Amino acid sequence: MIHPTHSLSRRTALKGAALAAIGYPLLRPLAALAAAPVTLPGRAHGIKLGLASYSLSTLSVEQVIAVVRQLELKTVALFRRHAPWGTGTVEECRSVVRKFTDEGITVTSTGVVELPNDEAVVRKAFDNVSGAGLRKFVGRPTLESLPLVEKFVREYDVIVAIHNHGPTDRYPKSIDAYNAILPFDRRIGLCIDVGHGWLADEDPAATILAARDRIYQVHLKDTRGPKDGQFTDAGPVIVGRGLLDIKAIMAALVEIKFAHEAEFEYEEPVPNKVPGLAESVGFVRGLLAAM
């Protein structure tokens, strides 16, 4: 169920997360972001918060690292502009991952990697992901390619988390992908995009509870735009300012004892994404601290 307002006020959430301590440094030039990170209070309930680097797709790898460190996030899912999962070499992908590892940041997965019914294309993706040291990536197989993906999941022992992409996608809702993968290896699971699911009239919190056994990543975002099948320029907003019931989503993750990553994917079309990311992270940390 979607709630335009939340029982936990934004003021309470932001206070709990000490957003002021994180926001002002992030308004400085990116070169200054490598300063010592702040320390945030509150309980996380075991939820691992990270960043989907698609949020910062126009920034360099070095700039992304600086932002992640300042936000005190520990994990990142790397978009293809930062690591060429489908087109590059194993060494190119490994080199990018190493840059994050050297800064104490764990690369847990990828941006969305297309997985057509083409053995050479799918093998290259698995080679690059596995060769770079990852045990999981976010994929978008077709229904026809699921048996092929299962073959490689078993060969490489790598998890594939299927990303839902809204009303016009082959998997409009995460529950659609869940139903499609039930006959296949359990290492084929879900990356639940709560925003795209909402656009397809899905209740993200309910799906988290229903599909708990196959969820391997969550993309956190918010929107106040119309349900027109895509995130319009007016649609994506800072997490907590939109129409999604973020509190219910986080409560569902806490209830299932979610052991994987909830990655912020902030898509508001603004020149500088960093302040909005800071507020989004602070809001969610505040929610968790108050639970």
Regions found by a protein language model. Name each.
Residues 51, 68, 100, 160, ...:
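Conserved, mostly hydrophobic/aromatic
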Residues 28-59, 66-67:
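C-terminal segment of N-terminal export signals and the immediately downstream linker at the start
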Residues 52-56, 81, 112-115, 142, ...:
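Active-site beta-loop-alpha junctions enriched in small/polar residues
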